[in-house]
Each structure stands twice: as structure tokens, then as C-alpha cells.
Amino acid sequence: MSVSSAPPSATPGFASEVRTTGLLALPLVLGHVSTGLIGFVDNVIAGHHGTATLAAVTIGTSLLWLPMLVPIGTLISLTASVSQLLGAGREREIGPLFRQALWLSLGLSALMFVFLSVVPPLLPTFGIAPDIVPGATAFLHAVRWGVPALTFYFCMRYLSEGMHWTLPTMLLGFGGLLVLAPVGYALTYGKFGFAEHGAEGLGMASAITMWVQASVFALYLWRARRFAHLQLFAHLEGPRWRAIGELLRTGLPIGITVLMEGGLFIVTALLIGRLGSTEAAAHQIAINVAQLCFMIPMGVAEATTVRVGHAVGRGDPQAMRRAAWAGYAIVLGTQALSASALLLGHDAIVGVYTDDVAVAALASVLLLFAATFQFPDGIQVLSAGALRGLKDTRVPMFLAMFSYWGVGMPIGAGLGLGLGWGPKGMWVGLILGLTVASILMGLRFRQTSRRLTATVTP
């Protein structure tokens, strides 16, 4: 097998690869949209119940989802493993691997359950206001019962995505929204014969939604002809530590990487919050818009993981490179559109969020910064997705650590707080951190893919 040195876009199959990746990514993007809408519904229900309820749910969801990034990121290694086995024609190994991933998800959920049990008593030491602590504690104690279902759900989701079937991610995402909205409303406000639980009610509704999503997904995988030959639930072996260890070796660095990136944005928000309510509100608007834009490259990156992994399993380095380049092409196009929309419509976008003149003025400027980091943000997440398809995760973890916490945070804090640039300085740090990450991740993929090509090419 020989690999052409010409750009993959010059090959006849490139347009087909772009189409395949795009179709694979679309349900994933919409699935992320459904997740964002769930957060929106939570805020609306809690906000109308009371300021203390909204604050409690905000604190509770932050303490749930930030550490939850580690198990979710760890389990995503299943996508590349399944995709590579599928590409290699070793589908009989997928069922046993999936069942070991279930054991891993059970262990990870147990750790999360313990975390959510021990954190609430510590909330006062974090400086949380006394009137918020009871609601946040009740929310966390309720939602923790859904964590096992949540990890099982992601395990099944990543299996399905590795098999090139992403539609359930979208359907179950919006299905969860249809469950959460009425149940959350009933339990929070005490409607339809239920007692009023406030913030705890939203935690209960979230846990119920998690179990409904996981149960429906399991039933679908059990009954669907598409997965029948995998015999996913034919039997359950005991834990096989070698297989679980392999999933951990590949997946844990992903979980840590995702945690470091999420931590960068959360710490940035906390530091900006120290500057004043106007600065905090403006930053929240800008970062919310940026997160909406990020859903597209994130979905494309997940699809690229699948396509790259499948090509690696087939032993086809040319297809692997073509899959990666297709992902880059889509992301560059979508990020160009996002950046253009932010540059041309930043004032109008801010107007949807607030009527406060001071907040709007600063948020409008920050959206210009958000437009600037569209390209590095898209490239870094796409490169990380392509590297996951190669099962190259350990070095990217250190690259992310350096980029976000060795470059982005020190520069942002130095400019924003040290030199008095305020939120603008913090956003410069975000841009530089993401830019360095995009360069290093891109170079790492180039190096790793070339090494893989050399091992396959005679």
C-alpha cells in the first residue's frame, strides 16, 4: 500500500467522506443542542420558582457536571475501540468489550456517587451563601441516584456511535427533554398531586430522566436488528481487568483533558466574577454564545473519531488521513460561518440576552473575542477527536495541560487581574490557550498519523 503525498482533498473520495462525516455528525450536534436545552429548561423552572432555587440548582449542576466530565471522557474511549474493531472485521469482540465497559461505568458511577455524597457538607467552606446550601445539598443528594444510569447511557451511546449509528444520541436527547420538563415542573412546584420539592425536585426529575434514557437505550440495543449480531446482552461475564485496564489507559487521559478544558472556562468565569456583576453578566452572555457555536465542531470531532478509528481498523492510512481532512474541512467551514455571524451580529445577539446598557456594551466586545477563537477552538477539538480515533490520548493530555494551564490561565490572569485589563484580558488568555492547543494537537496528529502510515506502508 502506498500513500500519496497529495492533500486528501485531491482524491476522488474526499467529497464522499465529507458527506459521510457530515451525516454522522448531524445527530451528534443536535444531541448537544438537546443537552443545552435541558440546561435551559432547568434554569427556567428553577428561576421562576425563586432566586435561591436558581442559585442552588446552578451550584448543584456545576458540582455534578464538572467532575462528571472525567467518567464521560473516560468512557468515550469505547467509541474508537468499537470503530477500530468494526473496521478490522472483528465484530465478535465488540459485545465482550461493551460488557467490560459496563463494569467500568459501574465503578466510575460509584466514585461519582461517593463524591456527590461527601461534597454537600463542604459547601459552606466554599463560601456558598447559607440560604443556598440547603437547596444545593438537596439537589445533589437527589441527582446522585441517577449517576449509574447516566454512565450506562454514555456507555451505550459510545457503542452505538462507534458502530456508525448516531441517531439515538439525538432522539434520546430530545426524548429526555420531553421527560424532564413536565416531571421537573411537577416536582419543583408541587403540581399534578406531587409535593413541592424546590431544587430537590429538579434533582429528582434529572435522576428520573437519566434512568428513562438509559432504560430506553438498553431496550433499543436489545431489540434492534442492527445490533442483534453483537449479542450485547447475551450474557454477562465478570470483570476482566485487562480489558478494563486498556479502556482506562486510553480513556482516562481523555477524561482528564476534558476536565482541564472545562476547568479553564469555569475558573475564568470565577475570576471574572470577582471583578463585578456587570463583568460577570457580560462574560456569561459571551461564553453562552460561544458554547452554542462549539456544539457544531464538537459533534464533527466525535464523528471524525469514528471515521478515523474505522480506517485504522481497516489498516487504510489513506482513508484515515482523508477522514481527518474531511473533519477539518467541515469545521473550518462551520467556524467561518460562526465567526462571521459573531462579527456582523454581535450587537443584535447581545440584545436578545439583556437590556442593560453597560452589560450589553461589554458583552458585545467580548463576542468579538469569541469570534476570534472560533478557528483555534474548532481545530483543537477536531484534532483531539482525530487523535482519539488513533487511540493516541496520553500525550494530548499533557499538551492540553500545558496549553490551558501553562499558557491560557497564567496569561489571562496576568492580563485580566494583574494588568487590569479585566474580562478582555481573561479572554485573551482563552484565545492564546486555545491557539496553542490547536497548533500542538494538529502537529501531534500529523506526527502520529505519519508514524502509523509508515508502519502500514511496505
Swiss-Prot record:
GO MF term set: antiporter activity; xenobiotic transmembrane transporter activity
Signal peptide span: none
Localization in the cell: Cell inner membrane
GO biological process assignments: monoatomic ion transport
Keywords, in A-Z order: Antiport, Cell inner membrane, Cell membrane, Ion transport, Membrane, Transmembrane, Transmembrane helix, Transport
Primary location: membrane
Keyword Lipid metabolism: no
Transmembrane segments: 21-43, 58-80, 101-123, 138-160, 167-189, 199-221, 251-273, 288-310, 323-345, 360-382, 395-417, 427-445
Pfam family, one: MatE
Record membrane topology: Multi-pass membrane protein
Record family assignment: Belongs to the multi antimicrobial extrusion (MATE) (TC 2.A.66.1) family.
Function: Multidrug efflux pump.
Name of the protein in question: Probable multidrug resistance protein NorM
